[in-house]
Amino acid sequence: MTPAPEHVHIPSRDGLPLAALVLPPGTGPGVGTAPGVVVLHGYGSHKENHVDFAERLAGAGMWALVPDLRGHGETGGDMNAGMIDDVLACLDHLDERGAAALGLRGSSMGGFLSLVTAPMHPKVRALVALCPARPAPLAARIGRDWPLGHPLEPATWRADGVARGFWHARGDEVVPWQNTFTLASRAAQPKHLRIEMGGNHRSLQHDPRIQAETALFLADHLGAEPRAPR
């Protein structure tokens, strides 16, 4: 049985406390050094929407940390460029718990943040981006100036050894799948791209098959070992 998530508050790099859930990997030798993955929600969402995937990661032998980014859920503050620091602080937290390698999995805005922040932390070895948002359309959707002007291309196309997985639903009504196809086509190896027929902007997040595929991608590239439930 997967244990109940641990509720924690993690100080972001500017001091803002981030509400988050942490799920440990199963029992067995080397639990402390098991890989860890930060799971990032999209705009207007919150951590509870992604507990199902966090449980899958824990079952696959990885730490899972799901935060409420600033301006979302139980975390205060305004949604601004400090979200980059939020992600890095969550990665630092898993590092402090002893995770040997780190990964990211983000959906929509969380996918954008995963792609942008991956090169900023030395222990990130893999990421999964589901229907990743682009800066300009996200700003238009929010209806005000989008504070994160980081271009995706330089971060995504780096030949830095980080494994980048891209999943996108062809029926996405918010972010065109062609955006992700273009990003992935020029990304360095190792990488993986899957364009799913049908679906919508949120359909891949909770699809059991996609969850299994993305958890396996992360486990393979982070060196996770399946563990007995706690």
For each predicted feature, which ranges?
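Short alpha-helix in the alpha/beta-hydrolase fold that links the catalytic acid
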Residues: P176-S185
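N-terminal cap/lid segment of alpha/beta-hydrolase-fold proteins
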Residues: M1-P29
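Short beta-strand/loop motif that positions the catalytic acidic residue
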Residues: A159-G161, F166-H168, D172
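The serine-hydrolase catalytic nucleophile loop
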Residues: Y43-E55, Q178
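Primarily recognizes the serine-hydrolase "nucleophile elbow" in alpha/beta-hydrolase
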Residues: C90-H150
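Catalytic histidine-centered segment of alpha/beta-hydrolase-like enzymes
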Residues: G199-R209
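Conserved alpha/beta-hydrolase
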Residues: L57-E74
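Alpha/beta-hydrolase active-site loop
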Residues: N49, D78-R97
